[in-house]
Each structure stands twice: as C-alpha cells, then as structure tokens.
C-alpha cells in the first residue's frame, strides 16, 4: 500500500496516450489544471474527491492512489493518465497484472498470502474462501498461478469484481448529452439560447438586490420606475408573475420578455392586457379602462411632444368611446380580443409598447435583436431624459466620442427610424420617433466642473469576466446618488462581446434581417479621456479616472454623456475598459443642477505602525504613558475623488464601509503640515465650505487595538504640540484621551466630573485646604490633587480633549490592578476613585477606636444611630457628604428565631440583574400534509431536555410528542437526531427542525391503501433484506415479539454492498420506524472531468422530507407522499392559465411527477444497494403498485431538470408561517425590567445555604438563617450600579438585560425601612462641645412609607471603615449583605408595617441632615479582615432618636447633624442640607439627655414630608462583550444639554439619542439641593503646599522617559 512508484510499469505513458483522443486529452489537461493550478502534482485528497468521487471507500481510494504512483508530494499527471486508461480501457491481461501488483511484494515477483489477506481485510473486510486454492501449493505464488486463479474467480474480491467481472461501470468519457436548461427554455419561448444565457446573468444581478431573496414587487418596482409610472409598476409585475406567488422566477421573466418583445403582435398585446387587468378576471372593466387611459396619457406626455386629440378630451368620453366602438359583448367591459382590436391602430397603446420595449432591453437586460432596434431603444431613452434635464442625485456616465460615433454608425442612430414588422414594436406610424434635436443639447449647458460619483457599491474590476462570475455577482447598495436604488453597477475593465457582424438572423416573424457593415464596435474605450495618475496609490472611489483638463474636454466633441441605465445596458452588451460616472449636483450659488466633471481629488495618509519599545518592568506598572521618542510616520495609502458638495459625514461613512473599519474606530484629519493637523469632527461641513481643493492630504486615523488614537498618543508624547487643541468650547464638554484601553477610567471620571457639587468643590480649590497627606490608608493627597487638576482642565472651556496622564499615573501607582492594556471594570475604578478621594480629603486625621455592638434586640433607630455615629467619627469628607448612605442588614436564625441587625454605610447600590434563566428557541414544524411549515417560539429552562421541548411544542402545534421527530438540518440533509434525554443545545451545527412522523393506528387492510394512508398496518410479518452482493432482495421473517402494527422499513441484517469495508457499515435494523428520509437532489454538470462518473455530480438542496413507509407501502405511495409535501414548491399552473402569453411548450409537469425517487446512502451521493464500483448514483424506484422495500436507505428526490428550472420555486423553500408564540417568546426574552424590580429584588429576603451558615449568639453554634437587606438612609448623590457582570456556574457572564429607569423624579422612598411613629416622641440632642467630632442631632419630620417587598439581589459596596460586616457570619462571600444577594428573579414578600405606621419626627427646627456614606473601596464581604475590624467597633455616642427613626427615607435620613464652631453656617464637612438651629439639651457619654417640654408637643404639628426625589444626570454605558467592549458616558451639563463622552470625543446629543439599553452605572442627584451648602468655608485655613507633589510626578515621569 505504501508504493512510492507507479505499479503500472507494464503500461507506458506513450501507449496510454495512443488510447485517448486529442479532445479527451485536452479535457483531462484542463481538468488537471483547474484542480491543481500550476502544480504538476495532485494531492491524495484532491484525487479522491475529483477523480474517484466520494462514493469510493477511503481505504480503497488510498490503495488506488498509491498504486498509481501517488506520494506525499502528490500524483504526477503522466501517472494519472496511465492509471485512468488502465481502469477504463485496459485489457484483461493488463488489469490482471495491475491487481497482481496491488498484492505483490516489493520486488513484484510474487504475492505472499499473509500480505494479501491483510490487504483484503482492509479493503473488503473479509477474505474469500476461494483464496486457499490460490495458495494450495505454498504461501506465495507467482504471476502465472495468480493470473490463472484470478480468471477463474473473478468475483473473489472487490477489485476483481470491479475490473474483470461484469464489465466496466465507469468510462473515460461520458457522451450522454441531456438537454441543458437553456435549451429547454429556448424551446418554450421566442428567445435564442444565447439570449437566455445572456439574460440569466442580468437576472441574477437584479435579483441580488432583493432584501428578501425574492424577485418581488418591492425589488421590481424601483428598477422600472422611472420611466414606468408607479401606477403601472404593479400591473407590469403581475404580467410577469404567472403563478401569482409575488416572485418572478427566471422562467417567468424569460417568457415575459419573449411575449413583450419577441412574440407576435397579438402576444404582445396580450401581455399589455395583463398589465391593465388588475383583478385578473380576463376583462377590462370600466374602472380599469379609466385607469388604463390615465396611465397611457401619462406615458404619452412623458415620452412624446406630439399633440393628439385624446389629450384634449374628457376621460369619460374616451372610455365611453372605446366601449361603444369595441365592446362586442355589450356588457360594459373589454375582453382580450376587444382590446387587441382596439390597440392595433391606437397610438397610445403603441407608445406604451415602445416604452415596455425600452425597459425590457435597458433595465431587464434583453439584448436587442438587431443593431437598428438597439439604436432606436437608446435614442428613445435619451430623448425622454433630455426632456427632464439633469436631476440632482442621479449619476451620468461619460463615453468617449470616438467610440460613440462608431456605435452610432453601427446602429444607424442618425438614420430615419426603421420599421420592422411585426418584430419591432417601435412602429408608431406618424407618431413614431421624430427627428428632434440631439437629446443632449438641452442639458449641455448645465455641465459644471464638479460633482461626486462616490459609489457605495464596490466595483469589481477584472480583465476577463466569466459568465459564471458575472451571473453570480451581487451588487451592493447602489450609487450614493443612484437614480435607481438597488440597481447593480457592473463596471469592468475589459469585457468585449465579439459577434460576427455579417450574419443573417431570423426575426420573430420569419423575415430575414441582414446585418451589414459598418462593423460592430468593440468594448467602450474611455482611456483617451483620462490623465495618467502621477500617484501610485489605490483609489478608493469609482470615478474611473481624472478627466483631462488640458486640452479642455468639450461635450459633443470629446465625449458624450448618458444616464446610468443606458450605461449599464451598453456595458452589458459591449463591455468597457473604464467607467467614468459623474453625479449631478446643485450649484450652491445658482441652485441649478450641473454635472461635476472634476470632483475633489484627495490623497489619504495612514499612520505607519510604530514598533513599541519593551518597557521596563519597573515602570510598566506606573501607567501606560506613551513614549515621546516614538515619532508617528504617515504614508500615502489611498486616493479618492469626492464631490465638493459632500459632507464630512458622507465621506467618513463611505471610507468606513470601503475600508471595512467601524465608523467609531476611524477619524479624519486635515493634514496641513507635519506639525499641524486639524480634526474634521464637524460632520455637517461640506468640502466646498472647508475650502478643500484638489490633491489635499487627509489623514485616516484608525484606533489602536488598545482603543487609543495614534494621533493623540503622538500629541501627548510630544506635549509641546498639545496647545493646538486649546480652542474655546463649552465648559465641561471636554473629552479624555484614551491612553490604552482606558475608556473604563474615562467613563467613570466623566460621570464624577459632572457631579456638580463635587466639581464646584474642586474648581474652587477647597480641596487644597483639606488635603490629608498623613492618612495611612490614603494616597498622600496625590489622588485628590491629580483629580482636582484634571477637573479644572475639563471645566476650563479651552480644550476639546485632555489627557488624564497624572491621574492615570497615580491610579496605576496605588492600584496596579488597573495598569496594563486590558479592559477593566469601570465600577471598580469608580469605587477606587471615590474611596481615594475620600481618604485624601478625610477631615478625621486621627481615627478613634470604635466598637461595633450587636443589636441584641435594641430598636433599629438606636442601632442605626450608633452605627452611623461610629462611621462619622472615622470618616468625614465631601465624598461622605455627597455619596454615602446606610443599609440595614438583618440575619434571622432559623433555629431559634434570633434576629441580628447591622447598619452599614454604602456609597452606591450594586443591583445584580436577574440572569436569564430561560432560553429562547425557535423551531420549525414540518407536517406530512404539505402545508407551509410553521415556526414556533419556545421559552425553555436552561437545563431543559428535549423531552420537555417536545412536550411544549406539542401543546403549540397540536401533534402528539410521539409524532414529533427532532432533527438538526445542515446542508440540506439531516446531520443529527437529538435524543430525548439530552439537554437542549442552543448552538448546533445546523438548525433545529421538528418533523411530523406517522404513528401506529388501527390495522388497515393492505389491499386498500390510499394516498393519504401513511400509517397503514401490515397484515404479515414479512420484510426484506439484501443478498450479500446487494443485487436482489429476499424475504425474511420478523422474530416473535416485534410489533406487527408498524414494521421498520429496514432489514434485519444488511451487509451494504455485499461487504463490511468501513465505508458502509452494516446496520442491524432501520433507525426509523414507519418512515424514511428523503432529500432533494439535482445533478450539477461539468465539462471538465476525469471519469464519466464525475461529469454529473449530485448536489443536495432544499429541506429534507419525512416520508411514511411501512412494509405495506407501495412504490406509488412513496411518490404520492413526496408530492404532497413538495407540491407547494412546484405547483402547476391553474387550468385557465395553462396557455400563457409565451407559447408554453413546457411539458415538465405533463407527466405525473416532476421527479424520480432513488435509493441512496445517508449522504445522498451514492446508491444504497449497489456496490461502490458500479458508481451508481441511486437505483430508481419505479412508480408502480409493487411494495416498496427500501430497507435502511434514504431516498433521493431527483428533480427533472426542466421542472427544476421552470417550476421549482427556490424562494419558497424557506418560507414559513410564524406562530404567535414566536413574537411572544421574543418579547418575553427581550422584555426589559424596570429599576423598581431590581430594588425589590435587592431588598427581598433570602436563605443562606449550608456553606454560609450563620453563627447565632443565642444558639452558640452555626445555624441556617435568612438574610435581608433594606435601605435606611439615602445620600444626595445616589449611584446605582447595574451588575451586568456576574459569576454564574463557574464562569463570568454578562447580562444583556435592558433596564428601564426614570430620568426625572425618581422616588426610591418605597424601599426605605418604615419607621415606628411611637418611637419618635423625643427631643433633639446637643453636642458637648464645638468640635466637629461631637455631633448634634436635630429632629426631622418624615412622610409615610408604603411597605413593599422585594426579591434577592447582589453586592453593595461598603466603606473601608471597620464597621463593614457582621461578626456573626461565617467567612464566605455569600455571608455578606452584598454577595449573598442572589441574581435570580424577584420573589415578592410583604412587610408588617402599614402605611399608617410610617414614622414622624417631632423636631422643632429645620435641621441639616447628614448624608449616608461609604468610605471604603472594598465590597461588603465576610473576609477575616472585616470580621476582625467589626469586633473593634464600639458603640459611640448615640444619635438623636428622631433623626435615627424618621429621616431614613429622606435625603441624609437617620443622620446625626454635626455642628461647626460657627453656628448657623453651612458645613460641607458634615454634609448638612439645611441650616440648623441649636438645641438646648444634649447627651453625655452616649446617654440620652432630657427632652424639652416644647419638643414633646411637636407630634401635634402638621407633617412636613420631604421625599427623596432624584433626577438622572449621568450614565456610564458598556457595550460589547465581557472582558472587552467599550465604555461611553452620557452626562447632563449645567447648560441643561446632554453630551456623549466617547473618550476624546464629546458631542452634544438629544436626550432621545442616549443609549439607555446598555446602561451600567446610573448617577442621580436629589432635587432641590443647594450646592453651596457642601462647600466648606476656608477663612483662616491654610492651603496645603503641593509643590513637592508636582515635583514627585515630574521626577517619576522623567525616569520613565529615560527608560524608554
């Protein structure tokens, strides 16, 4: 088997050549060249596929390949020819020698028995019994003994049966020549075969414009209108659409064009009659006649200037005149015969025929029969265009006058119109074509010197365009200013159709039309009109070339111009070496349309990728700041011509599409010099306005992979050039440069920057008075200083974008996890940023020790006040005042019912989104009755099995589960049958379908099967199997115990092809019960082949079928069953339409079935009964009354070629009806959730699992428990984090769930813990001194809160303070108030409080309320660090009862009010919102003071309820995948306008344009807050010295630069 040389040495190459003809040799050489290219060797895989075919078993094919001399290098052509000649034309003696060589030893002198048996096992799977006779005298034999034995035992094994027994089943040449599709179609129309071949190319190009894949009215209308009026477009479409399926197939368009342009006059009139017969009832009613007259008059006005009487008559008079003269039935309508008599001499009808004649040739692609017809068609079109003049937005094409004159002589363009009867419809009598002035004279004066010809359809240039490639070419979206949207633009450099100009052709009427000189012109040559390009760069546009300016080109002398449809027709008929499209634009000064001959010729530069220097390991962790030593090189990459009237946006979109670059990843710069570039970011400016002239350089900038912009990075690296960015802009509308996947940072910074009270704090410089450079857990003030500097730049109003180098450097220094070029989580960066700002600005320089006490049954107000006081004793800053709130965490022991309550600070709410626990699946059900398949939509559990899928589908489609067969269809065949116990997979190789299969029914007599009885039961237990050679079936009996109602159509035992060779394994029983599978198949013919078996290769198409089949099924029943299912795809014409407008000779449906059934293997390529060496494509199943014993084979539905091309509706294959469940399922899957549902889920109760058991202080052991989170107090600035990234089932996934959230008047008060009013009878407390660390609490009144329940949610970020966690929870992520929030759907629960039990406070005076806080960058967790810290927190001074109870739902609710030494001042450090009044009584050492009598009566006062109403002011959005994607920010400026911050780009946009679907972090601001109250007074305070901080940064940056 491993022979390295050919085993056919006994047959020379020269001898083999003598046995093949020259034609055969040329075909074999061409086939070899097509298959192997320029190589002289054919690989093994190619040999098996192209020469032998897929039907040959792989082991056998490998043996043949090696015996021919094939090696790892390949098989030489000479050896291939020798082998093919031996197999097909070799003598028996030569074949015997060949077989001997297969089994012989290396020396080739003898065959060893052991080696032969080994090879037979590989090839055949067994050793024949007769082999022992061959080796009866020894273990090896020579050729003579082997030959004698072989000729006596020709059926011994596969090779002998193939080559010596029964003749050769494959030949070198296949002489059979079945009629081609074109020949068949030519026989049923008046078109020649060449016309049909030419027309097919045009048809597929037109059909490719369809949005649905069908040549429907939506596609047809824009192609023909104009010049066809829209009122006639539908009628014209219906005239082509014979079978009324809203699709014009190629047969229909061929017959229609034949009837309209080439048929007898009566047939043409019949075609027009169909156009006007709207209701298709065979007559023209009075209404239809009126519409016809209106349309015909419009056609006349569009195409002629002649005056006719009908133009001055009343419509009713015209209609009545026609009826009076031609209504032979006197029933008020015209029959077809009446219409034909009227239209023969009517000029209106003749003019409509002329128009249809033009459209059919120019638009639909029919080639004119004579040059004279061609000239009249083009002339008529141009005359009509000349009356309209130039229309802005249309494209015209320039043609060299030299070629145009030659063409005009060829078609006799200037001669008098030629009347060709009756083959030409251009016979308008005296109203035929007049001798008007040249059609272009009226538009000649409007030719300008500029315009745009940018085409969004990519032009395909090729030196030689084959008919196959042209026919399959699909056009894009048409010209940018296309007159016929969707039409193709087929420009090629060379496509010359050379016909003999001196030949005789028969016209449609049999008259001889003699084509005499002048000669037919060649391809259109426009080269003399253009200049040679001095720049050698790829042109991105399709202008074809720059026209010469010197000498000046003159219209009519140097060039002619034609509209786009005429150009396409001429190009289709002649070809061209150069297309010169020029669009029509309106002059900006005169507003008159003109042709722009000389558009702007632009030169486009691209950045040359710079090699990145390996950074030092020391400094790479200090932020990815660009190196200043990497100059950016820009090189000329492309050229392009654009209209001076085009906008930057249009050019940007075109370049993006042409270069296949996302629009958001590309920018354009105006290049003035190496050091002076201008960003073209105003998309509405036109080139003319920007004064961009010819040969202007533009830079195409493309984002780096790390999302940074090369030009920006270059500017940053050379900081002296950044000054050019300093241009006036709106304050705050400044972008941030991407420094390498830093959009996550930019997005968070922009959100925080648009937090107005915080920004005013930094802009006013107050942060410099509060820098805490000694905080051990801070950043020595660097974070606050760098952020403050950046904010001042962002709000200076002098720069369009800045580079956050210092802040990026600082973040990377203190948090290396944010370093590198990887995408990060913007929420994590936001948490780090807020925490860093808080610690750097913390007014508490010496943090006291605090102890966290257990709630131990104490009232919530007391525990909350204690926790909040502890928090404030260690954390006070502008960040605490604005962003911090308080959460209530309750854990309840399920053993003893003990409740432990904790109150923890937060700086944003992290709400997990409910992960999709359902999958959306759409499945198509195909029934046996042939009805249109129906698509159903299902919503299944993520772990659902196919059993559940079938059950749900059964409820929808009405079939029993036993009748549903699920199959994965791929490549028009069934690839897999999912098992019921398998889990449903969304990702399959093909698409999932459900087939109806027959089910057992009560027995029916086998003697009376009907066409619809697919489940008839057998009356006998007989079934058939095949003999060992696969030739004849023989009956066997079913063993006892098998069901006798429905018997499998398989064999009990099947040795496929008589052998078990690994290619066709034996199957014990049919895998199908009561049915078989059928596949659609057609034969694809090729003229270049090696063996006859490969000339016609099978190709599967369409959807496979399930065909009922039992042992009682007749062969005719199989045909009936198949026809029932496919008849909708190939329906014959209705009887009344059998005689169509083209003389229809199609007999493809004349016989009973348009297909033949054959028995095939599963792959559908080869026969299931015949051995492989017969190269059988499938044994035919005759349509008779015999029983059909198919076995376990498949059935191929071999379509008759004529029926396939003329009747089969390919577009109907994928047509399905959508069940209402599809829309319902899609809606349910994509249905958004609202923010309230997320909050309800967040505040719902959940059970802690066994791995997160709670240590109960009562039980003194770990117990199961439930946990619940609630909101206690809310901050002025509420940040809501939608947790799209979650860790589920061991992997991180992103939720694409859409969350709907309010932009204005968001009220979260319903989710605050309701207070008990009975506990609100108290007096406010006063601090013991004037120090800020001793808070004073004022009573506040609060509104009633409706108690609402919620379901589980997820993490909440808390403070870095030691009060982070309950000490009772086991160290587990789920043990925290945050991570124990599950991400499932919410489960409603109820609270005990009623609306009437909401708290009120009795404070007498207006108090300034402390805002909730979280000062930590760490999430709530049960880590050991937090657990230990929580034990250290003692109970501090207890805050006032009123504030603790009543203000939780109000801004800063439940917060102790801190009073500065300056009474009545607004203290930013304390986060007060309202001015306070000092209260008389206080507390000492945490003990409550006495309540005043005055305060005790406050409960009688009217409630002053203040709701925490919020407005949205910023959104951070994430688009794309997990671990990548992109962040952008939408924020509201103080000018009340919304802006989109996309890294360095900042653009104003309408609020409706905000992409809320991808929202990730929401920023809300409470209504009515006074920013000034957050600004601390700096009188008497000293500003921190930050010079050393600046020096540190400069020093570190210089070290970095040196290392670069």
Curated annotation (Swiss-Prot):
CDD domains for this protein: EFh (cd00051)
Enzyme class: hydrolase
Annotated USP domain residues: 734-1567
Localization per Swiss-Prot or TrEMBL: Golgi apparatus membrane
Cysteine methyl ester: residues bearing it: 1601
Phosphotyrosine modified-residue sites: 1173
Active site (catalytic residues): 743, 1526
GO MF, one annotated term: calcium ion binding
Propeptide residue intervals: 1602-1604
Primary localization class, coarse: Golgi
Pfam families, alphabetized: DUSP, EF-hand_5, Ubiquitin_3, UCH, USP32_N
Catalyzed chemical reaction(s): Thiol-dependent hydrolysis of ester, thioester, amide, peptide and isopeptide bonds formed by the C-terminal Gly of ubiquitin (a 76-residue protein attached to proteins as an intracellular targeting signal)
Annotated binding of Ca(2+) 1, by residue: 241, 243, 245, 247, 252
Region Disordered, residue ranges: 1343-1362, 1367-1431
UniProt function note: Deubiquitinase that can remove conjugated ubiquitin from target proteins, such as RAB7A and LAMTOR1. Acts as a positive regulator of the mTORC1 signaling by mediating deubiquitination of LAMTOR1, thereby promoting the association between LAMTOR1 and the lysosomal V-ATPase complex and subsequent activation of the mTORC1 complex.
Protein name: Ubiquitin carboxyl-terminal hydrolase 32
Natural source organism: Homo sapiens (Human)
